[in-house]
Amino acid sequence: MVLKLFSFCLLLLLPLYAKEYTFATYPSNTPSKIIQALTPLMEYLSAQSGDTFKLVVTKDYDELTKRIEEKSVDFAWVNTKNFVLLKEKIPSLHYLVTYLEHSKSRQITPYYQAFIVTMKDANITSLEEAKNKHFAFTDKESTSGYAYPMMIFEAHHINPYTFFQKVFFLKKHDKVIEALMSHSIEIGAISDGTYYNALETYGDRFTILATSEPIPLDAIVASANISHQESQRIAHILETIPLDAPSNKAFEEHLGWASAGFVKKDEHFYDSFKRTLKVPLYETVQ
């Protein structure tokens, strides 16, 4: 009887200590798809932690960075570039986990790649043949839609801003595919996941002209106003998400991501990205 009364009292006290957290992410796809994909993850975090996690999809990468800097969000899903630059600017930023995916060989991996692609009917078989064509990046803050493609161009001694007739920034990876399909552009930079989704949707109509080196997948971070202990508690919850969890299925269903959960790496896992910052064209060409 005493034990039951004690347990009941604990249940009554839980709401007093439960916290409400804001979890932000960037618009890599249409916001409605991102909300559908991440809502089960928010529900999982809320159920496992006893706290409430509310999802925010920012307008763009810049807004996400700004909100992390001003601590108006508690947790955030950030891309590789965001993480490296934010960590340099805010050393107290807490790294939690790295996103995992099933590769095309069905192995679980913390990496992905950037592709530069064209349509087969464009009859372009190499980057050099794409001179004076219309090209699209996604966003200057994108890892696979800008940073790593710029490394590819540097390796080929190509300045995209003078090599192509016109360069566009279409913000989202699926918008690059749409522009290719409508022949508004002849060549574009996208993530490998976007390419494989397009392959399933439109068939074998694309040619990969160049492939980047492996890129560390996105990270989840906690802002500086979250304690180290709390960060580790949430990281553990993320690490232990089952493979068959609704959150993983939602990523597959709404974004086409072959999600495999999360893993805790050393934050220096992302140091390889720093080489992209040394590409001359990367920061100097506007």
Give the positions of each predicted feature.
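Extracytoplasmic small-molecule ligand-binding "clamshell" domains
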Residues: K19-K89
